[in-house]
């Protein structure tokens, strides 16, 4: 079968000698985001310098994860990224991968050997929040998680990413090798800390001396990653195939914008990603908060109120000037005042850029997709800023409507009476509340979900009053009218 390796393409394949690459990075979780972000930065560095930092890709899950690894191997580890701007699309053939492994093909041993090689300097991860196997309440490693239980009983044949990291570090210690840096690239707050807690938690349960060695020898830098990479659909893949002239099953589409802020805390060397647009900083947290509140917060606001207003995508939603204006006001009037940024950070320019990114019609980022898992997202994106305004007396009416939009969305019925496919770990609780309550009583019942609202907000009369009023307005007047009235 013809692939991107042996076809005449309208775009250049990587021109450098692939044999110069060393597998210095082992990456766990070769999903769409990683391929459009970290692997692409690494590709640009190979393109513009004599860097030899290559990536050994690892997928751990069965099914699609394995198929992707097999497909990459059929294409000599090349794949296509389509950067879709509002006006045009730029295709790139990415060549930063040196190897691609899967336990069903290479065995646990093959993956552990790769991680324990002397040249492996960084083990990076995009395994989603679930992949860190943390207990939601304590933030510590959940020792009752089925994967973690398996890894404690079968330490040399792990299943979780955390299990692989701990066993690989044990092997390195045993061989007298230098440790590697563990670099989380997941869209999780203080992701380096989350990774460290998980790795040390498992190491401690296995062998306290190993945990002490890891604590002393391994670093866990935090990173802030940003790029909109919608899930690849058959339509997207076909569209890219039409432009390429050949089908690439590993292709992905994304927006042109990308950002990567990295805490400069590496134990065994690192690529000069700053030469191709990444930022190395001493503290990532201010940048994380900026993204979380301004980008993710306004994304959630637009997702709930956009879906209820009958819009399928974020780009569709911001074609309505009232939504566009409301999202910008939310960012600048209500989210920006809650941030403490390094000198020289232009939040107005950042908000303007975000509106431009949201307006990109070629991405088709669905409001329904962004509305998923709201119970997990709401506290960080919308509720923490509300707490600051309640303390400091700031205005937060856009935030109130955003929270009310989420409440209205979880009713599971849209403004036309059609069912909404609500995807959320707390769906059963929502359904129970929906069956018993409506109106202000429903708001009160939702506020009783302490996993979302904690104990403080339901006790705050200003919060309860504002959110209840916004919710009742939404039920009576609909989302479009409420957004226009802000």
From Swiss-Prot:
It holds the Pfam family Mannitol_dh. It catalyses: D-mannonate + NAD(+) = keto-D-fructuronate + NADH + H(+). Pathway: Carbohydrate metabolism; pentose and glucuronate interconversion. Gene3D superfamilies: N-(1-d-carboxylethyl)-l-norvaline Dehydrogenase, domain 2, NAD(P)-binding Rossmann-like Domain. It is an enzyme of class 1 (oxidoreductase). GO terms for biological process: D-glucuronate catabolic process; mannitol metabolic process. GO terms for molecular function: fructuronate reductase activity. It comes from the Bacteria. The keyword Membrane does not apply. NAD(+) binds at residues 25-36. Signal peptide: none annotated. Coiled coil: none annotated. Keywords: NAD, Oxidoreductase. Its EC number is 1.1.1.57. Belongs to the mannitol dehydrogenase family. UxuB subfamily. This is D-mannonate oxidoreductase.
């Amino acid at each position: 079968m013809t692939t991107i390796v042996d076809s005449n393409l309208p775009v250049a394949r990587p021109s450098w000698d692939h044999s110069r690459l060393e597998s210095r990075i082992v990456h766990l979780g070769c999903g769409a985001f990683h391929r459009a972000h970290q692997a692409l930065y690494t590709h640009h560095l190979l393109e513009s310098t004599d860097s030899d930092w290559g990536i050994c890709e690892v997928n751990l899950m069965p099914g699609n994860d394995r198929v992707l690894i097999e497909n990459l191997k059929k294409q000599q580890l090349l794949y296509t990224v389509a950067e879709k701007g509002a006006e045009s699309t730029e295709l790139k053939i990415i060549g930063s991968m040196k190897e691609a492994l899967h336990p069903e093909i290479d065995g646990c041993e093959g993956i552990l050997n790769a991680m324990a090689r002397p040249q492996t300097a960084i083990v990076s991860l995009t395994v989603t929040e679930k992949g860190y196997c943390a207990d939601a309440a304590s933030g510590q490693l959940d020792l009752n998680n089925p994967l973690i239980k398996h890894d404690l009983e079968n330490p040399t044949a792990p299943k979780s990413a955390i299990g692989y990291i701990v066993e690989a570090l044990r092997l390195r210690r045993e061989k007298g090798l230098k440790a590697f840096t563990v670099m989380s690239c997941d869209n999780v707050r203080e992701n380096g800390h989350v990774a460290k807690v998980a790795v040390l938690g498992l190491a401690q349960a296995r062998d306290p001396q190993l945990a002490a060695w890891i604590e002393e020898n391994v670093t866990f830098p935090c990173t802030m990653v940003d790029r909109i990479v919608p899930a690849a659909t058959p339509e997207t893949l076909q569209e890219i195939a039409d432009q390429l002239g050949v089908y690439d099953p590993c292709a992905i589409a994304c927006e042109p914008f990308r950002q990567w802020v990295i805490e400069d805390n590496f134990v065994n060397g690192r690529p000069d990603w700053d030469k191709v647009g990444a930022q190395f900083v001493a503290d990532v947290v201010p940048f994380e908060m900026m993204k979380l509140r301004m980008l993710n917060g306004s994304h959630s606001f637009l997702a709930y109120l956009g879906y209820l207003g009958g819009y399928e995508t974020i780009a569709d939603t911001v074609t309505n000037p009232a939504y566009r204006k409301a999202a910008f006001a939310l960012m600048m009037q209500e989210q920006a005042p809650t941030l403490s940024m390094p000198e020289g950070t232009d939040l107005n320019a950042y908000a303007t850029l975000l509106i431009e990114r949201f307006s990109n019609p070629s991405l088709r980022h669905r409001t329904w997709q962004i509305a998923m898992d709201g119970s997990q997202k709401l506290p960080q994106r919308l509720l923490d800023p509300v707490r600051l305004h309640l303390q400091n007396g700031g205005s937060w009416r856009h935030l109130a409507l955003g929270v009310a939009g989420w409440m209205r969305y979880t009713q599971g019925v849209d403004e036309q009476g059609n069912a909404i496919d609500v995807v959320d770990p707390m769906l059963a609780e929502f359904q129970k509340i929906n069956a018993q309550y409506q109106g202000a009583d429903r708001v009160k019942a939702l506020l009783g979900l302490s996993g979302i609202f904690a104990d403080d907000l339901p006790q705050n009369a200003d919060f309860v009053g504002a959110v209840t009023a916004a919710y009742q307005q939404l039920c009576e007047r609909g989302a479009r009218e409420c957004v226009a009235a802000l």
